[in-house]
Amino acid sequence: MRINKELHIKDVFIIESKKHHDNRGWFQESYHMDNMSKHEFDLVFVQDNLVFSKKHVLRGLHFQDDNGQGKLVSCVKGSIYDVLVDLRKNSNTYREWMGIKLSEKDSKFIYIPPGFAHGYYVIEQDSLVNYKCTKHYNPNEEIGIVWNDSDIQIDWCDIDGFNSSNVIMSEKDQLNKTIKELNL
């Protein structure tokens, strides 16, 4: 397991976990508390989620108002473009975003700490995303930022096949507000 902590946004990191292949298929360790502790990450996950999505689905950008959730995100099947936005007001990268392609082929995971908005665009049909959370989901604390907020300027066009007219969103996500409207 290799952990990359040298990203431009502090406290976000990427984990690469090797897949062990044989004639039966493959095995991959998705989380190992002792290995994470060696890298000074003492994380306790309390909820594990699986999300199945069609191609062109865009989920987010979501965050929880009360200290938020840390998330360990991976794409188990298919591929996604995963995006996070730093909403920690005392951070040097406040309101900055980063994106990473996650797929079943690349064996990468991304850890997103509390204080970030998170979302993703589904690149391949029938993609399956897994994320572990450091805090239980609370619908009363959930807030959404619109995916194309002009103050954040996420470059979704960097994704193969992305076309804003093809985006599929939930009714709830269509009502997300801008960062200005939310006073963030």
Regions found by a protein language model. Give the residues of each.
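Non-catalytic, conserved peripheral segments adjacent to functional cores
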Residues: 1-105, 126, 133-184
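Conserved metal-binding segment of the jelly-roll/cupin
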Residues: 102-125
